[in-house]
C-alpha cells in the first residue's frame, strides 16, 4: 500500500508541475500535439488492435459480462474515430485566455474575467479505451494536466495509448507528464487519486453507479459527475401525435444503454386514450416492455404493473415506466421527484407549457419537441465531452472544453490607489 501511495503521489507531483507548462502553452502548440497524437494513432493501428485483443482475451477468461466486453472492443472504425475526434478538438476555439465582461469602475480601474485551466484533472473510468484519448485530447486543448485511471480490463490498450499520447506531446515540446495513465491495476490507486488534494483539482468519474457513488462519498476533491440517466418524455395535452411518436421512438429505442435514453413516459390524462395505445404499440413492436400505472394498464392490456421503484429506475434495457398525469403541473412535479436530473423532454404545441417546463424542471438538459438523445457534447456543438454533470456547481450538462476551465478576475489600472 505504501508503494501505491508513493507511486500516486509521484504522478500527482509530476502532473502539478506539468499543469503549469500546459497553462502557458499557446493554441498552436496544443493543436500540434493533438494532430501528432492523431497521426500516431493511425500509424500504430496494428499495435492498438493487438493490445485490445490481449485485453479482450483476458476479460473473457475472467468472465467479464457481455455489456462490458462490448465497451472494451476497439475496432478499426473506433481507431479512426479516436483520431478524427482529436482533429476535431484541434479545430475547436481555444477557451484559455479568453477575456470577457470588462467594465470601468468609478475609481478608474477596469475589471474583467479571464478563462483559465482548472489545473490537474483526475479521470476514472471503466472499460472504454476511447475515453483515454477523448480525455487526453480535451485536457490538452483546455491547458490542463490529466491523470487517467482506466479500467483494469483495458490496461494493455491504455498503456499503448499512453505511449502514443506521450509521443504527440513530445512532438510539440510539451511535457509527457501532462497526460499520465496509471500503470497499475491495483484498486488502491483509485483511493489515493481521489484524496490527493495537494495535487489534483477535480475528479471526473465515468462508469457505473456503484463506482461513481463510491468516488462521490470518498473523494476529498471536487467531483464532476452524474450517477445515472433516468430521463423522461412528457406528452402534453396539446402534443402533435406524429411528433410524439418520432421523439419517443428515438428517445427510447435508438440505443438502450446510454445515459440520455428515455426511461419513463408521462402522458397528459386528457389525451391518454388517444395517445397511449399508438405510443405503447410502437414501443412494444420494438421489443420494449411497458410497466405502467393503473390508468395505463386499463388502456394497454400488455402493460405490467409499475412499482414506486420503477419510476426511479434507469433500466438501460428494453423497459420503460409509463404514467398518466393530470397536466403539466403533475408532470413537472413527478419529474422533479423521480428523475436523476439528467435530461427531460416535453412534446407540446402550447408555448406557455413549454416555457414552464423549461423553467421549472430541475435537470441539466431540458428539451422541447426533440429527442432526449440530443443531450450530448457533440450534438451541442461542444466537440468531444469528458462526461455529463447533473450537479449544479461549476459544470452542468455535457462537459466539454469550457467545463474544464474556470474564470478569474483581472484588474487593469494606471496607477490608481484605493481611497
UniProtKB/Swiss-Prot annotation:
Root EC class: oxidoreductase
Cellular component terms per the entry's GO annotation: cytoplasm
Transmembrane regions: none
Predominant place of localization: cytoplasm
Alphabetical keyword list: Amino-acid biosynthesis, Cytoplasm, NADP, Oxidoreductase, Proline biosynthesis
EC number(s) reported in the record: 1.2.1.41
Localisation per UniProt entry: Cytoplasm
Pfam families assigned: Aldedh
Cited PANTHER family: DELTA-1-PYRROLINE-5-CARBOXYLATE SYNTHASE, GLUTAMATE SEMIALDEHYDE DEHYDROGENASE
Function recorded in the entry: Catalyzes the NADPH-dependent reduction of L-glutamate 5-phosphate into L-glutamate 5-semialdehyde and phosphate. The product spontaneously undergoes cyclization to form 1-pyrroline-5-carboxylate.
Name this polypeptide is given: Gamma-glutamyl phosphate reductase
Encoding gene per record: proA
Amino acid at each position: 500500500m505504501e508503494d501505491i501511495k508513493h507511486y500516486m503521489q509521484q504522478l500527482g507531483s509530476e502532473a502539478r508541475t506539468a499543469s503549469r507548462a500546459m497553462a502557458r502553452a499557446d493554441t498552436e502548440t496544443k493543436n500540434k500535439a493533438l494532430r501528432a497524437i492523431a497521426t500516431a494513432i493511425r500509424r500504430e493501428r496494428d499495435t492498438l488492435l493487438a493490445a485490445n485483443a490481449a485485453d479482450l482475451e483476458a476479460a473473457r477468461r475472467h468472465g467479464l459480462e457481455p455489456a462490458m466486453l462490448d465497451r472494451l472492443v476497439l475496432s478499426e472504425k473506433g481507431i479512426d474515430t479516436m483520431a478524427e475526434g482529436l482533429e476535431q478538438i484541434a479545430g475547436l476555439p481555444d477557451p484559455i485566455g479568453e477575456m470577457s465582461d470588462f467594465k470601468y469602475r468609478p475609481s478608474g480601474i477596469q475589471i474583467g474575467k479571464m478563462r483559465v485551466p482548472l489545473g490537474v484533472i483526475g479521470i476514472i473510468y471503466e472499460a472504454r479505451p476511447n475515453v483515454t484519448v477523448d480525455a487526453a485530447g480535451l485536457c490538452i486543448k483546455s491547458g490542463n494536466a490529466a491523470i487517467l485511471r482506466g479500467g483494469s480490463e483495458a490496461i494493455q490498450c491504455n498503456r499503448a495509448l499512453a505511449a502514443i499520447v506521450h509521443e504527440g506531446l513530445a512532438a510539440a515540446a510539451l511535457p509527457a507528464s501532462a497526460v499520465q495513465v496509471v500503470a497499475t491495476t491495483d484498486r488502491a490507486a483509485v483511493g489515493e487519486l481521489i484524496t490527493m488534494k495537494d495535487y489534483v483539482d477535480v475528479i471526473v468519474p465515468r462508469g457505473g453507479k456503484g463506482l461513481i457513488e463510491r468516488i462521490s462519498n470518498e473523494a476529498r476533491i471536487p467531483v464532476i459527475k452524474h450517477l445515472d440517466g433516468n430521463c423522461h418524455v412528457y406528452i402534453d395535452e396539446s402534443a402533435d401525435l406524429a411528433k410524439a411518436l418520432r421523439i419517443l421512438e428515438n428517445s427510447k429505442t435508438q440505443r438502450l444503454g446510454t445515459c440520455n435514453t428515455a426511461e419513463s413516459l408521462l402522458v397528459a390524462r386528457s389525451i391518454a386514450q388517444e395517445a397511449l395505445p399508438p405510443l405503447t404499440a410502437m414501443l412494444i413492436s420494438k421489443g420494449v416492455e411497458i410497466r405502467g400505472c393503473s390508468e395505463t394498464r386499463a388502456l394497454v392490456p400488455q402493460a405490467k404493473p409499475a412499482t414506486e421503484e420503477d419510476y426511479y429506475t434507469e433500466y438501460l434495457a428494453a423497459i420503460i415506466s409509463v404514467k398518466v398525469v393530470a397536466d403539466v403541473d403533475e408532470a413537472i412535479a413527478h419529474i422533479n421527484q423521480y428523475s436523476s436530473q439528467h435530461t427531460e423532454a416535453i412534446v407540446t404545441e402550447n408555448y406557455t407549457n413549454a416555457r414552464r417546463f423549461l423553467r421549472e424542471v430541475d435537470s441539466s438538459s431540458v428539451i422541447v419537441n426533440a429527442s432526449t438523445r440530443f443531450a450530448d457534447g457533440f450534438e451541442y456543438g461542444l466537440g468531444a465531452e469528458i462526461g455529463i454533470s447533473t450537479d449544479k456547481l461549476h459544470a452542468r450538462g455535457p462537459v466539454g472544453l469550457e467545463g474544464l476551465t474556470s474564470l478569474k478576475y483581472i484588474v487593469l489600472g494606471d496607477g490608481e490607489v484605493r481611497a
